[in-house]
Structure formats: C-alpha cells, structure tokens
Amino acid sequence: MFKKKKYTVIRQAISKDLASFVANYFMMQKQVYDTCRNARYFSPFENILGYYESKDDQIPNTYCAYSDIAMETLLLKCQPEMEKVTGLKLYPAYTYARIYKKGDELKRHKDRFSCEISTTMNLVHIHYL
C-alpha cells in the first residue's frame, strides 16, 4: 500500500502501555517546564525541557520538544516496522513532539527534505469539555 499511495496507517504500532507511558512522561515534562519557567529557575530562552514556540507558523504557543530522548528512543523502536511497511532502508533524522491544545489544528504541510518519510503518532487523545 505504501508504494502506491505514499502513506500507510499502522494501527497499534506500539502497545497501549508504552503509548500511555510515553504520553504521561511528556505531559509531566511539560509540567516541569511550566513550573521551572514560572518560578524563573531558568531563562525563558532555555529549551532543554521543551518550549512554547510563539513564532511557529503551524501551531503557535503550544508546548513542544525537539529531539527529546524518550521520543528518539521511540523512533528507534519503530524503525524496523517502518522499514518493513515501506520497503525502504530508513535513516532516523529527528523527532518533534507536541501537546495539542483545544482548537489546535495541524494543517497539511511540507516539511524539510530530511522528513521525506515521516511518522506521525498519536499517543493519547483527551476529550475537551
């Protein structure tokens, strides 16, 4: 299917337990970042625990992290399955994780060349009231 349509859907690519673990980890990391930022433990320009990108054209003012170690580990775990499904030898480039807020919408877009083959994974879905 991938070669024909240039995409495929892999259901349950990781276990529910692993998805929950990684999602909880990332939400806790956001809480730590928010606490440290609000208490001024570090500069608002520090991004080691993630950041809120105000100039993001896609989803502004939403917590995100570039190349987080847990997400990089998840990328490597999923690589063999992605190679099997695509029939390609893949070379991991980077990860980018984001916690969407109510009203956030990621519109169809083109990323940089290193994202020629990408994976999008929804770890948890929270219904907003």
Region roles according to the model:
Residues 102-129:
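Catalytic core of non-heme Fe(II) oxygenases with the double-stranded beta-helix
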Residues 9, 96, 118-122:
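Conserved hydrophobic/aromatic beta-strand scaffold that supports enzyme active sites
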Residues 1-86:
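Non-heme Fe(II)/2-oxoglutarate
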Residues 99:
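Conserved active-site beta-strand element of glycosyltransferases/polysaccharide synthases
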Residues 83, 87-88, 124-128:
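Short helix-capping and hinge/turn segments at secondary-structure transitions, especially at repeat
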